[in-house]
């Protein structure tokens, strides 16, 4: 992990296209401003973790539904056969 020290109004540039600037310092809180291309997704870490958790749960639910649907199709075919 790269660790940098920045003061208010100072910035870092990532990959020549993402700018992270220290906008405000208030006690132990720092406000960052981020400028990035539209195709770059930016999330707070805790928000991303929640999104990934919800996506994982949705995928599990989809698998259960697909198994149920497949079972019903097999039953239908067996009855017709």
Swiss-Prot record:
A GO-annotated cellular component: cytosol
Native species: Halothermothrix orenii (strain H 168 / OCM 544 / DSM 9562)
Quaternary data: Homodimer; the beta-strands of each monomer intercalate to form a hydrophobic core, while the alpha-helices form wings that extend away from the core.
UniProt keyword annotation of Protein biosynthesis present: no
HAMAP family named among the record's database cross-references: CsrA (MF_00167)
GO molecular function, one term: mRNA 5'-UTR binding
Cytoplasm recorded as keyword: yes
Stored Pfam families: CsrA
Task of the protein: A translational regulator that binds mRNA to regulate translation initiation and/or mRNA stability. Usually binds in the 5'-UTR at or near the Shine-Dalgarno sequence preventing ribosome-binding, thus repressing translation. Its main target seems to be the major flagellin gene, while its function is anatagonized by FliW.
Keywords for the protein's UniProt record, in alphabetical order: Bacterial flagellum biogenesis, Cytoplasm, Repressor, RNA-binding, Translation regulation
Protein's name according to its UniProt entry: Translational regulator CsrA
Gene3D superfamilies assigned: Translational regulator CsrA
UniProt-listed InterPro entries: CsrA (IPR003751), CsrA_sf (IPR036107)
NCBIfam families assigned to the protein according to its UniProt record, in alphabetical order: csrA (TIGR00202), PRK01712.1 (NF002469)
Domain of life: Bacteria
Subcellular location: Cytoplasm
GO biological process: bacterial-type flagellum organization; mRNA catabolic process; negative regulation of translational initiation; regulation of bacterial-type flagellum assembly; regulation of carbohydrate metabolic process
UniProt record similarity statement: Belongs to the CsrA/RsmA family.
């Amino acid at each position: 992990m790269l660790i940098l020290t920045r003061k208010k109004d100072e910035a870092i540039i990532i990959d020549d296209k993402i700018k992270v600037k220290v906008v405000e310092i208030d006690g132990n809180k720092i406000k960052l401003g981020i400028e990035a291309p539209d195709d770059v997704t930016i999330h707070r870490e805790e928000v991303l973790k929640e999104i990934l958790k919800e996506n994982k749960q949705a995928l599990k639910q989809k698998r259960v539904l697909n198994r149920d649907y497949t079972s019903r199709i097999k039953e239908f075919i067996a009855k017709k056969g």
